[in-house]
Design a protein with these regions (language model features):
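Internal intein/HINT superfamily modules and their associated LAGLIDADG
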Residues: 2-290
Length: 290
């Protein structure tokens, strides 16, 4: 009985004519000189990254970059200010630092660092406002959910070792979850804006009715040390006078304020300085002012 011939399942490589290849290489060189990575170039030109690498290995039309060099050039593409976190002088700067303290991630890849912010689709507005403040609106990317119990998300990635190092100097470093630190700017306007940023990242507000009366509760979530510092700050400004404890729960702690009169006054201070805010939470505060 004759043996059946095996089927060749290997993928065929796409063949490019000499002229096509020449034009593609010209485009690759141009985009590479503009600072785009090989991954970006392959997506933009619709050509496999391995093909670009193979051609470059043969013809040496550009020199591959290190991760750090690639990050710096990507910074130039988006034209953001790498010194943004070097000196915190405005409420919006303090807000962004506060938000990153609560919900940002600094990745240290030894040769380079990057900052990543990820928000749920419903809060895309805040990511747009932060990216506008940093002058990198085009860097926002959509992340489609992978499962039915997940949400669609938007992300903002900043490839800048300088900006990450400045954040680390402020006290916002890699692997900070559970070890967030309160940053004292020694300036009341900056401190309130910073607290608002942290609240938008790791805080919550509930407005409800009970027995015909309007009620509210505001909370901050974090590690014990961070929340104690927040409590000290609030008490120094005349708030949380009757709050003397922090609620322990699995993996973190909560700090609650439940006096509606106090929460109304707190809202006025939180939103007094700077323009960046999470509209969803601001609208809940605003409902108390009616």
């Amino acid at each position: 009985m004759e043996a059946k011939e095996g089927v060749n399942h290997s993928k065929r490589q796409r063949r490019y004519g000499a002229r096509d290849k020449e034009e593609i290489i010209k485009s690759v060189i141009k985009l590479h000189d503009q600072g785009y990575s090989q991954v970006d170039i392959s997506k933009m030109l619709g050509i496999a990254r391995n093909t670009i690498k193979r051609w470059n290995d043969e013809l040496h039309f550009f020199e591959a970059r290190t991760p750090g060099e690639a990050g710096k050039l990507k910074n130039k593409i988006y034209r953001y200010n790498e010194d943004y976190f070097e000196n915190i002088l405005t409420p919006n700067q303090a807000y962004v630092v506060g938000y990153i303290t609560g919900d940002g991630t600094v990745f240290d890849r030894k040769k380079s660092k990057r900052l990543v912010l990820v928000l749920a689709e419903q809060d895309k507005q805040l990511l747009q406002d932060i990216s506008e403040e940093l002058n990198i609106e085009d860097a926002i990317k959509f992340r489609k959910r992978n499962a039915s119990n997940e949400q669609n998300k938007y992300s903002l990635t900043i490839n800048s070792t300088k900006m990450c190092n400045d954040l680390i100097m402020l006290g916002v470093g890699p692997k900070k979850t559970g070890f967030e630190k309160w940053i004292d700017f020694e300036n009341e306007e900056l401190q309130w804006a910073y607290l608002r940023g942290f609240f938008d990242a790791d805080g919550h507000i509930r407005v409800y009715e009970r027995n015909g009366y309007q009620k509210a509760r505001i909370g901050f979530t974090g590690n014990s040390k961070m929340l104690k510092e927040i409590l000290v700050f609030l008490k120094s400004k005349g708030f949380a006078v009757n709050v003397n404890c922090i609620t322990q729960k699995q993996g973190c702690c909560d700090l609650y304020l439940s006096s509606i009169k106090e929460i109304k006054l707190l809202g006025k201070e939180l939103y007094k300085h700077g323009t960046i805010k999470l509209n969803r939470k601001y609208e809940k505060f605003s409902s108390l002012m009616i």
